[in-house]
Amino acid sequence: MQQHTLHIAGGVARNPLVRLSNPVTLDFLDGEHIAIVGPNGAGRSLLVDLLTGKYPLRDGVLTYDFRPSATQTAYDNIKYIAFRDTYGSADANYYYQQRWNAHDQEDAPLVRELLGEVKNEALRQQLFGLFRIEPMLDKKIILLSSGELRKFQLTKTLLTAPRILIMDNPFIGLDAATRELLFNVLEKLAQLASLQIVLVLSMLDDVPSFITHVVPVENGVVGEKMERAAYLRTFRERDAIRVEADAASFGELQQRIMDLPYENTNFTSDEVVRLNKVSIRYDDRTILKELDWTVMRGQKWALSGENGAGKSTLLSLVCADNPQSYACDISLFGRKRGTGESIWEIKKHIGYVSPEMHRAYLKNLPAIEIVASGLHDSIGLYKRPHAGQMAVCEWWMDVFGVAGLKDKPFLQLSSGEQRLALLARAFVKDPELLILDEPLHGLDTYNRRRVKKIIEAFCARRDKTMIMVTHYENELPATISDRLYLKRNR
């Protein structure tokens, strides 16, 4: 009889706030590698929490068989890592702008210190060799590239020798080369007889070839486990039908945005951004070296490059978040930095969303207040908007498909729903300059198409300027007019 590493039958959470729509019945068999897939807000994370025993059951049964593990507790044998962006999950000590402040980097621990003492020397050697950890040991954790950090996080988790490893969005924020590296590493891990891999994904493209089965989740309903090939075939057929159906509604959505009135009373300069021989260093590493770059009003830039090339650092200069900008020759909206302007005078022109902002913005306010904070560029809502401003906030939430969540606490939204709310926040003041750093992070196929259409319509309006970062070429809107590719300084 085949070993059932995990078995749940008729499972219903005791707490009604975390229940899925239907009772859950599901089996994970030894040798299977599973992908849990579904749209934003479908219930994927709730399913994982149920399977890992986080929520006690009101009805049903949940059992495990972790052989050959020496222990049989879920705590020892199931490890869960959720990746929200390039740099992992938010933590309580993280704050916006932390990456750009040198004194925070000085206090950051080394990789060696975080890995600690390893009791199983054979396992340590195997993992350090697989992930090439040795060259990273004396680096500060906050200065790791995204690929290095992903390898560190996996190594630290795997050193506990789990029987089941669950990873939520493991490929998020990675460039093509780093995604391929991670694919290859996971493929090697999948060959270990003692490890079962479960991936929680929102993008069909991220289902690797070593995955044997797929569990679909939609509207809180957990579907039947399917073989990978059968699921992909079914999904593509359904998606082709939906693309046709969405075309008309997306057209109407774009027209609503195109019909917005022209308002450009905040600045008159044709030059939006100018960098002259700008260099940025952290410790002994040069991030940007003598960079010249000019962005003119109405241009739409695609900013690209491998992980660690300095894209987010460059955007931090444009957004007035990086203290090193005062020592550089930088002009924003026609004014040279350091000539008396406040950061708020700069930010009032900018609508911005980024992984760093998402990590820092863990405020348990109603979602509409998160959107409203974009009117004043604050992390949190400290100035009460008037009724007209709140109506504008709700309008943009409707555009992004999350108006129905306006009163729901932000931290109770799924990661994808949070991203949509933060996108509405970036657009809410109808900014002259839109800065989108990986805006489609964690969004499902439908919402990625929807947001791309919104960006295209917004950028087609008079005098709108945009800078967008993405590692997926197919995410770029058709309105892109210029490109800047950054190479990593080795």
Regions found by a protein language model. Give the residues of each.
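Conserved ABC ATPase "signature" region
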Residues: 119-136, 387-405
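Hydrophobic anchor residue at the start of the ABC signature
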Residues: 153-154, 423
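ABC ATPase nucleotide-binding domain signature region
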Residues: 46-120, 315-379
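Conserved ABC ATPase signature
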Residues: 140-144, 148, 382-385, 409-413, ...
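Conserved beta-strand-loop-alpha-helix hinge in the C-terminal portion
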Residues: 217-251, 477-478, 486-490
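Catalytic Walker B motif of ABC-type/P-loop ATPase nucleotide-binding domains
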Residues: 165-169, 434-438
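The feature captures the beta-strand-to-loop junction immediately N-terminal to the Walker
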Residues: 37-39, 304-306
